[in-house]
């Protein structure tokens, strides 16, 4: 089911998490990115067509902006009992196949997804150097079957503005994608 992001309030401090990278095994928290000029948290997964469409472009974005001081993590929060293609071993395969230059973290208990009010994959949260929410919205207007090529223009524009010290874009279009696959009984109030 395709849903839009919840549009967390701008200025919100980056919610805390402690999650493991499925490739390196390292533990990451937002604190690890406090010295970055910006911090991007991306809720993604392996199976969703909305994410599959932009995977290569996410890597290109990361390759362009990580050297400019943007810290990036991707998080998968899906219920792996019902969606085994999103399990950590499959996440690792996906990260290696696409050459993710950022950590791909597994949110087994779905606590990070709850804290960020993540609703869909992809769901993107760009924080400033103080880890206050600057942009939450779509990567770009590309969707499966709409014949628009992914470019990441919305996220790129927001990131460029942030790095230039400009105000956040006034128009922020919600991200759209597959709903987070919540464990039975763990669905948040904003779901469904």
Regions found by a protein language model. Name each.
Residues 1-172, 179, 186-192:
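Chalcogenol-based redox active-site neighborhoods
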